[in-house]
Curated annotation (Swiss-Prot):
Residues 25-111 are mitochondrial matrix. This is Mitochondrial import inner membrane translocase subunit TIM14. Probable component of the PAM complex at least composed of a mitochondrial HSP70 protein, GrpE, tim-44, tim-16 and tim-14. The chain crosses the membrane at residues 4-24. Residues 58-111 form the J domain. Gene3D superfamilies: DnaJ domain. GO terms for biological process: protein import into mitochondrial matrix. One of its GO terms (molecular function) is ATPase activator activity. Residues 1-3 are mitochondrial intermembrane. It is found in: Mitochondrion inner membrane. GO terms for cellular component: PAM complex, Tim23 associated import motor. Its main location: mitochondrion.
Length: 111
């Protein structure tokens, strides 16, 4: 019982000192937050579903490569994406089919 009260008191003291630090150094913290990089990954998110007939550029986006990638790079990218999305490991069968379709399209068409 006493140990719990001591822990609660120490917790409240820590929160109080933390809040005091933040309030006193608010300008410094704000400047530091502005210096942090903006989350660029959210801005480059592809906002759209799959096309009816997959294009070479869509296949490249699915695999995370350029449309003019070499066959070795296509194979490596397919392997990495399939390891993460394989249906036997909890991935979606639909996404796995699209990934395989993208690989087949990239390997069959010439840039």
């Amino acid at each position: 019982m006493t140990g719990g009260l001591i822990a609660a008191g120490l917790g409240l003291a820590a929160v109080g000192f933390g809040a005091r630090y933040v309030l006193r150094n608010q300008a410094l913290i704000k400047k530091g937050m502005e210096a942090l990089p903006v989350a660029g990954g959210l801005n480059s998110y592809y906002r759209g579903g799959f096309d009816q007939k997959m294009s070479r550029s869509e296949a490249a986006k699915i695999l995370g490569i350029t449309p003019s990638a070499k066959p070795a790079k296509i194979k490596d990218a397919h392997k990495k994406v399939m390891i993460v999305n394989h249906p036997d490991r909890g991935g979606s069968p639909y996404l796995a089919a699209k990934i395989n379709e993208a690989k087949d399209l990239m390997e069959s068409t010439k840039s």
